Amino acid sequence: MDRMMKSKFVALALSLFLSQSVLAGGVGLSSTRVIYDGSKKEASLTVQNKSKTEEFLIQSWVDDAAGSKKTPFIITPPLFKLDPEKNNILRIVNITPGLPQDRESVYWVNVKAIPSKSDDSENKNVLQIAVRTRIKLFYRPAGLKGDVKTAPNELRFTRNGNQLRVDNPTVFNITFNQFFANDKEIEKAGMVPAKGALNITLPAGVGSVSKIKYNTINDFGSXAEMITKNVD
């Protein structure tokens, strides 16, 4: 095995080891986003403690993009202890009428895992860190017209100076996964709101942009197929 192949093998093995350690050592969620079907009374999300030894105090809430907790949603239970290798289901309930019925609305689910103090940490200088996970909550009204699978194809792009305007005529919020202008990747392009627009700042030196290539994140948190669109 030559040196380059050996280095790649070691790097791969190390990355697999680290990823398995992370998965085995803490709290995880059953999905990377929650789709709340407006025809249902609630949506759910499973919290998983993958540690064999540690227990955690789990605190959960819903807020908006600005961080305000004044939202139409509550989570039950908002606070509970999660034992090692156990799961618990969070129930997200819409308690306030009045959300738009002609498009999706977006909020955020926050789950904070606080390690319990162990006997071994008594009288020791042990640093315990609470970890918060924040994922999108999409409220999808009942009877919403349109196809979420084809919505990314309907985006329209217009350039104005160093800004690329993305118009979304659909009723669905569309989150970019990868985004390329002249084959140059623009990281964290963001989300285009339903029936709204997003302005993306193009990096210096990108040149004249006539085509955009991108893919988006679907309801399951996976990357959809790449799409190529012209820029007006």
UniProtKB/Swiss-Prot annotation:
It comes from the Bacteria. It is found in: Periplasm. SUPFAM superfamilies: PapD-like, Periplasmic chaperone C-domain. Keywords: Chaperone, Fimbrium biogenesis, Periplasm, Signal. The keyword Lipid biosynthesis does not apply. Induction: Induced during the exponential growth phase. One of its GO terms (biological process) is cell wall organization. Residues 1-24 form the signal peptide. The keyword Disulfide bond does not apply. GO terms for cellular component: outer membrane-bounded periplasmic space. Part of the lpfABCC'DE fimbrial operon. LP fimbriae may participate in the interaction with eukaryotic cells by assisting in microcolony formation. Belongs to the periplasmic pilus chaperone family. This is Probable fimbrial chaperone LpfB. It comes from Escherichia coli O157:H7.
